From Swiss-Prot:
This is 1D-myo-inositol 2-acetamido-2-deoxy-alpha-D-glucopyranoside deacetylase. Catalyzes the deacetylation of 1D-myo-inositol 2-acetamido-2-deoxy-alpha-D-glucopyranoside (GlcNAc-Ins) in the mycothiol biosynthesis pathway. The keyword DNA-binding does not apply. Residues 280-321 are annotated as: Disordered. Zn(2+) binds at H15, D18, H150. The gene is mshB. InterPro entries: GlcNAc_PI_deacetylase-related (IPR003737), LmbE-like_dom_sf (IPR024078), Mycothiol_biosynthesis_MshB (IPR017810). It catalyses: 1D-myo-inositol 2-acetamido-2-deoxy-alpha-D-glucopyranoside + H2O = 1D-myo-inositol 2-amino-2-deoxy-alpha-D-glucopyranoside + acetate. It comes from Streptomyces griseus subsp. griseus (strain JCM 4626 / CBS 651.72 / NBRC 13350 / KCC S-0626 / ISP 5235). Binds 1 zinc ion per subunit. One of its GO terms (biological process) is mycothiol biosynthetic process. Its cofactor is Zn(2+). It is an enzyme of class 3 (hydrolase). Keywords: Hydrolase, Metal-binding, Zinc.
Length: 321
């Protein structure tokens, strides 16, 4: 791939729809601003539940056709966000959705959870060295809420960032990602969103979720970047609607298959865990590329320091492997 824009953003997610819920406004904003946005999705989401009754036959325990259907949903969502570069890790269907933690699907041959981290990371290294992103976004060590595929996506993304920077690994030119972020949701913002839901649309869904049900929710001191995506609220909402088997959207609120309403947030928050902050200590970045040269090739310096001050990136992620 040649002649890419100066700014290049890579996002690594577990299933189709995760990108739109977590980063839809961010992706739409950077795509509109001319950055090259690459999404890597690790599975097809075959084990998901299905909201529309007319599509109930797609589930894994019936026709087992949900994965291919969600490929189409993801393509539609990417059109809404203006993102042209989407890949499935290792190719579509290479790794299967592992189901929720403790499910028998966790250990199924070919499931993402049962796959060696280094094996899966090798495919992501290829993408990193091809696209040469300055910024990588993925989950925290818990995957946001403990789903095995989210945890594995975190491990694979962090490992791939290490391997891609290692000149001794593989034959392609190494590349160091300058900044690595984890998805976060500020607790206070989530609480305010739930209060709006309770006061303005209490009957929009059969029930209302709790703040602690929101993946990646954390206190304000862990938030280092805040992306204002309000101008792209429509694009994010449309992308989420495209994932119709998984998400029901009602104005500024949505629900998953559990029918529990929650706020659709267009200010998206992140925690910088590798790289140098682009703002003074105590301030929040408003741009994930803050502090980077405007036309860098993104190679960065080997062993870019962790924003948490950890010499070993594993220390910054709670020792996750």
């Amino acid at each position: 791939m040649k002649d890419l824009p100066a700014r290049r953003l890579l996002l690594v997610h577990a299933h189709p729809d995760d990108e739109s819920i977590n980063n839809g406004a961010t992706m739409a904003r950077y795509a509109a601003e001319g950055a090259h946005v690459t999404l890597v999705t690790c599975t097809l989401g075959e084990e998901g539940e299905v909201i529309p009754p007319a599509l109930a036959r797609l589930t894994a325990d019936r026709d087992d056709a949900l994965g291919p259907h969600r490929v189409g949903e993801l393509a539609a969502a990417m059109r809404e966000l203006g993102v042209d570069d989407h890949r499935f890790l290792g190719g579509a269907g290479r790794y299967r959705d592992s189901g929720m933690m403790g499910a028998e699907q966790n250990g199924r041959p070919g499931s993402f959870w049962s796959t060696s981290v280094d094996e899966a990371a090798a495919h992501l290294v290829e993408v990193i060295r091809e696209v040469r992103p300055q910024v990588l976004v993925t989950y925290d060590p818990d995957g946001g809420y403990g789903h095995p595929d989210h945890i594995q996506a975190h491990r694979v993304a962090m490992r791939a960032a290490d391997l891609a920077a290692d000149p001794a690994y593989g034959s392609d030119a190494p590349h160091t990602v300058a900044k690595v972020y984890w998805n976060r949701v500020e607790r206070a913002a989530a609480e305010a969103g739930f209060e709006r839901l309770r006061t303005t649309a209490p009957g929009a869904f059969p029930g209302i979720a709790s703040v602690d049900d929101v993946p990646g929710v954390t206190d304000r001191e862990h938030i280092t970047a805040e992306i204002d995506g309000s101008a792209y609220a429509g694009a994010k909402s449309a992308a989420m609607r495209a994932h119709a088997t998984q998400i029901a959207v009602d104005g500024p609120f949505f629900a998953l298959s559990n029918d529990l309403g929650q706020p659709l947030l267009t200010t998206e928050c992140y925690q910088l865990v590798r790289g140098v902050p682009g703002v003074p200590e105590g301030e929040r970045e408003s741009d994930l590329f803050a502090g980077l040269p405007p036309a860098t090739d993104g190679t960065g310096a080997a062993g870019a320091p962790s924003a948490t001050g950890a010499a070993n990136p594993a220390d910054a992620e709670g020792g996750a492997a």
